[in-house]
């Protein structure tokens, strides 16, 4: 519930809300495109009418333009990301304290949907941990300060880098950017410190297999904080690929092309879903043929 992805979701919801009120702002191609974003915007309209409406010229003021839609080169991708970041900054400036409502509304709706879906699937989590809490309690800043005290941080080009190569990583990692913002890695370190400080015998991470390269840096950070790295375990989970009529179902969260667990359960039932997921070890690819 912290970081850029949540900001993008909040912005996407607000832009759809503006569109529902006749305010025409070009919707960024790299924002969240799914119909669920329109649903969240509609909920805002029902609850608050036009309270959060701002004029299009104010929203777009000072934002860099978008490249041609058919351009897929690296420069065009960077321009789209810069445009998105500028829109987020404008939203925060124009809405002021109301930005927190938009952000929280998007978070609450998606989190409630995830919780409900999992509960119906027979999966219950005792604790849901807030990433934002790591910042609100100052744990991220304390973590970076601890690493600095122990000599594991150096400054380069205005950014703070963790010497993760000293612990077997392929390169050092930024924990605080030159603009003062902390990276996702910094909050990951803080979260692991929190886990250890809660006194568990085992600290288990369940990650997607594409995060395999993340293990050395996290393990290195745990060692750098003088914590017992032997307690850290990482379980890698391969992707489940859905097939319908012999065709692979393409998925992209931002573009809105995906099949939810709820839709899958509705199509084949809870028992069949649970059976198929248990059919393979978590570190093996799963082809789920509908």
How should each PLM-predicted stretch be described?
Residues 1-290:
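NTP-dependent nucleotidyl-transfer catalytic core
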């Amino acid at each position: 519930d912290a970081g850029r992805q949540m900001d993008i979701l909040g912005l996407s919801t607000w832009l759809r809300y503006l569109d529902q009120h006749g305010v025409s702002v070009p919707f960024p191609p790299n924002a969240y495109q799914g119909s669920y974003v329109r649903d969240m915007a509609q909920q805002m309209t029902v609850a608050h009418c036009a309270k959060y409406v701002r004029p299009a010229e104010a929203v777009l003021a000072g934002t860099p333009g978008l490249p041609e839609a058919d351009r897929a080169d690296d420069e065009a991708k960077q321009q789209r990301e810069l445009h998105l970041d500028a829109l987020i900054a404008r939203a925060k400036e124009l809405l002021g304290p109301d930005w927190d409502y938009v952000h929280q509304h998007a978070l609450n709706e998606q989190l409630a949907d995830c919780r409900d879906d999992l509960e119906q699937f027979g999966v219950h989590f005792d604790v849901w941990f807030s990433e934002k809490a790591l910042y609100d309690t100052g744990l991220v800043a304390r973590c970076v300060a601890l690493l600095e005290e122990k000599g594991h941080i150096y400054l380069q080009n205005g950014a703070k880098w963790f010497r993760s190569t000293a612990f077997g990583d392929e390169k050092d990692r930024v924990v605080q950017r030159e603009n003062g913002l902390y990276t996702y890695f910094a909050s990951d370190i803080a979260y692991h410190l929190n886990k250890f400080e809660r006194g568990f015998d085992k600290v288990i991470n369940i990650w997607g297999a594409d995060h395999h390269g993340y293990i050395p840096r996290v393990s290195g950070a745990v060692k750098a904080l003088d914590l017992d790295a032997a307690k850290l375990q990482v379980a890698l989970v391969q992707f489940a690929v859905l097939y319908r009529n012999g065709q692979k179902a393409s998925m992209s969260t931002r573009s809105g092309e995906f099949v939810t667990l709820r839709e899958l359960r509705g199509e084949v039932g809870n028992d069949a879903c649970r059976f198929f997921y248990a059919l393979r070890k978590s570190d093996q690819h799963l082809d789920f043929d509908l």
